[in-house]
A protein has these predicted regions:
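Rossmann-fold cofactor-recognition segment
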Residues: 1-9
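Catalytic Tyr-X3-Lys loop
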Residues: 6, 23, 30-50, 93
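Structural signature of the Rossmann-like NAD(P)-dependent dehydrogenase/reductase core
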Residues: 30-33, 45, 66-73, 110-114
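Catalytic loop of short-chain dehydrogenase/reductase
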Residues: 37, 67-92, 97-98, 102-105, ...
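A short, exposed helix-loop element centered on a Lys and neighboring polar residues
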Residues: 53-54
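A short hydrophobic alpha-helix cap/turn motif
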Residues: 61-62, 104-106
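Short beta-loop-alpha junction of Rossmann-like oxidoreductase domains
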Residues: 82, 109, 113-128
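C-terminal helical subdomain
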Residues: 106-109, 113-118, 133-175
């Protein structure tokens, strides 16, 4: 399992904070979601991302360094049938990340957006989608440790070569 090394923690002298905000309901038809559902999904992704990013940036600007990484999905760049609420929220989160990156980059804050495109290999996913996960080929789901490595790699980039966005997906994922 991935863990930051004690050497990396000692050299940065910066606390590592991770914030995860799950979206509980994200599948809805463009013709069916009521305003309350659309708003709930938007608040869980876009507005929560804004609040979290704003508060993190406020604390980082004074130090002149820090990293804020937002997690996207395929819906960040492409809507699909049945994903109206989720796609709208993820598009908004990606636009927020772009705006923050342009504003905060010159102040030493690295803002990035990582699109996680595919099923994540976990007990929760395997129990919720047993038939689908069983049918996947070896390497058909994203390994959580490999996802963490990508996030850490983005965080550790030198200032002269910052990545704004990367896509993570299994090699067999259709995209």
């Amino acid at each position: 399992m991935w863990r930051p090394t004690s050497a990396s923690a000692e050299t940065t002298k910066t606390p590592l904070t991770i914030c995860w905000i799950p979206i509980k309901r994200w599948v809805s038809s463009a013709s069916l979601p009521c305003g309350a559902i659309y708003r709930q999904v938007w608040e869980s992704a876009a507005f929560a991302g804004f609040l979290t990013g704003r508060e993190a940036a406020r604390r980082m600007v004074g130090r002149g360094r820090g990293t804020v990484i937002f997690t996207g999905a395929t819906a960040s760049v492409r809507g699909g049938p049945g994903f109206a609420s989720f796609a709208g929220a993820k598009h908004a989160l990606r636009a927020l990340a772009q705006s923050m990156a342009r504003e905060l980059g010159p102040k030493g804050i690295h803002v990035g957006h990582i699109i996680v495109d595919g099923m994540i290999d976990s007990d929760a996913v395997r129990s919720k989608f047993p038939e689908k996960t069983a049918a996947l080929p070896v390497g058909g789901m994203l390994n959580p440790d490999h996802i963490a490595d990508a996030y850490w790699g983005m965080h550790a980039q030198p200032r002269d070569a910052w990545t704004f966005e990367m896509d993570l997906r299994p090699s067999v994922e259709q995209w």
